[in-house]
UniProtKB/Swiss-Prot annotation:
Pathway participation: Amino-acid biosynthesis; L-lysine biosynthesis via AAA pathway; L-lysine from L-alpha-aminoadipate (Thermus route): step 4/5
Organism domain of life: Bacteria
Quaternary structure, from the entry: Homodimer.
InterPro entries: Aminotrans_3 (IPR005814), Aminotrans_3_PPA_site (IPR049704), Class-III_PLP-dep_AT (IPR050103), LysJ (IPR037537), PyrdxlP-dep_Trfase (IPR015424), PyrdxlP-dep_Trfase_major (IPR015421), PyrdxlP-dep_Trfase_small (IPR015422)
List of residues that carry N6-(pyridoxal phosphate)lysine: K255
GO molecular function per UniProt: identical protein binding; pyridoxal phosphate binding; transaminase activity
Required co-factors: pyridoxal 5'-phosphate
Species in which this protein is naturally found: Deinococcus radiodurans (strain ATCC 13939 / DSM 20539 / JCM 16871 / CCUG 27074 / LMG 4051 / NBRC 15346 / NCIMB 9279 / VKM B-1422 / R1)
Reported function: Catalyzes the transfer of the amino group of L-glutamate to [LysW]-aminoadipate 6-semialdehyde, generating [LysW]-gamma-L-lysine.
Cofactor: binding details: Binds 1 pyridoxal phosphate per subunit.
Protein name (record): [LysW]-aminoadipate semialdehyde transaminase
Chain residues that bind pyridoxal 5'-phosphate: G112, T113, F139, D226, E227, I228, Q229, T284
Gene Ontology CC annotations of this record: cytoplasm
Residues binding substrate: R142, T283
Length: 429
């Protein structure tokens, strides 16, 4: 039991009452974070291997980011992108400095899905084409434009024809023949994640991603890599495409880009940017000075602290430890850097719940069978040891089938009790 179940919090009640209802809320209220640790309102600590779906790769409340935000908040928070701003210029310079060569034009926005929207529009104006190739099991976000690239039917079907799924061909991630057949002279862009995150933590093969580069060039289409989850050191390089020696024409960026502030970008080659008419796209909050200040501090800290090397080394350490777990429930441990998935032979949800509830470790699902770990790169090896030990205990102790049967037995006996007492009351009246 968490403290909240014993003593329901007013914050938990308020959030559950007023939220739109689209989220499956946990029974816990988080109030503070530092590095790889977060604390709930009752003071219980958790090792965070979710970090806001992969946002806080630098750790929660990194001191440089906190200082930059504090200073900028007292100076200037709002300036639209039509009016140049010192922090925005500094951020753009820093960002282009770490991006693969040639990606030196940037559209700034606020979330991953907006970066995908931008990518879609820039690809259409750059090529004069409007067909796309995306990947089965791919996830690109949930706005209607981005949703057209997202494969999972449950995210698309509730919105029927409002999601444009006629102009997108989905190919099996890794299938070279399907890829070659799908990319034609009508294709504006091929969209893919270098490691599928939501789709089960699946790294692309070098052959597949390199063939995507080759065939898009041959057909005059763009290659757009979705590095929203993989970017900014998560996979052990600043960007995952560096593992494959591939430079795309455009790259969508978000999550860890700016120290936890809601920031995103579509970075592209000049030839792609130059074809968008002035005023053809825009956003109010994109490139706001507050996020830009956080972004500058975050990018500098990533470089100074060797965050990519940390993610590479700790990722290998954690993956080795997970692979050493002897459990018949594990089908496969896979990933790249600190983007790690453990595919089980059964549903992952009860194990993820037990990790949080019983062990104080936050992790998340990626498809119903996969437990996904996205710890910050500043996590210590001791914390990794704790996470792996907790996971092993949970695999040993949780038995969803037995628990479900016990639940059913309890329900049946409760119903039996009710029938007996109803029967008794009838008799006694
Ligand atoms: C690969 C990928 N693309 C796009 C998105 C959408 O980003 P956002 O949730 O910021 O809109 C996500 C979010 O998880 C993602 O992992």
């Amino acid at each position: 039991m968490t403290g909240n179940e014993q003593n329901p919090s007013k914050w938990l009640a308020a959030e559950k009452k007023y939220d739109s209802g689209v989220y499956n809320k946990h029974d816990v209220v988080m109030v503070r974070g530092q590095g790889a640790t977060v604390w709930d309102e009752n003071g219980r600590s958790y090792i965070d291997c979710v970090v806001g779906y992969g946002v806080a790769t630098l750790g929660h409340s990194h001191p440089d980011v906190v200082k930059a935000v504090q200073e900028q908040a007292g100076k200037l928070m709002v300036m639209p992108q039509t009016v140049p701003n010192d922090k925005r210029a500094e951020f753009l310079q820093e960002l282009v400095g770490v991006l693969p060569q040639g990606l030196d034009r940037v559209f700034l926005c606020n979330s991953g899905t907006e970066a995908m929207e931008a990518a879609k529009k820039f690809a259409i104006t750059a090529t004069g084409r409007s067909r796309f190739v995306s990947m089965k099991r791919g996830f690109s976000g949930r706005s209607l434009g981005a949703l057209s690239f997202t494969w999972e039917p449950k995210y698309r079907e509730p919105f029927g024809d409002a999601v444009d799924n006629k102009s997108v061909d989905f190919v099996t991630y890794g299938n070279l023949d399907e890829l070659r057949a799908a990319v034609t002279e009508q294709t504006a862009a091929v969209i893919m994640e270098p490691v599928q995150g939501e789709g089960g933590v699946r790294p692309a093969s070098a052959e597949f991603i390199q063939e995507a580069r080759r065939i898009t060039r041959e057909k005059g289409a763009l290659l757009i890599l979705d590095e929203i989850q993989t970017g900014f050191c998560r996979t052990g390089k600043m960007f995952a495409c560096e593992h494959f020696g591939v430079i795309p024409d455009g790259m969508t960026l978000a999550k860890a880009i700016a120290g936890g502030t809601p920031t995103a970008a579509f970075a592209m080659m000049s030839e792609v940017a130059d074809r968008m008419p002035a005023g053809g796209h825009g956003t109010t909050f994109g490139g706001n000075p507050l996020s830009m200040a956080a972004g500058v501090a975050s990018l500098r800290a990533m470089k100074r602290e060797g965050l990519a090397e940390q993610a590479r080394e700790k990722g290998a350490y954690m993956m080795d430890k997970l692979r050493a777990i002897q459990s018949p429930k594990i089908r496969e441990v896979r990933g790249l850097g600190l983007m790690i998935g453990v595919e089980l032979k059964e549903k992952s949800a009860p194990y993820i719940h037990a990790m949080e509830h019983d062990e104080g470790v936050l992790c998340l699902a990626a498809t119903p069978l996969v437990v996904r770990f996205l710890p910050p790169a500043v996590i210590s090896k001791e914390q990794i040891d704790q996470v792996v030990a907790a996971f092993e205990r949970v695999l040993n102790n949780v038995n969803p089938r037995e628990e479900r049967q016990a639940e059913l037995r309890a329900q049946q006996s409760e119903m039996g009790q009710q029938q007996v007492s109803q029967g008794e009351s009838v008799q006694t009246e």
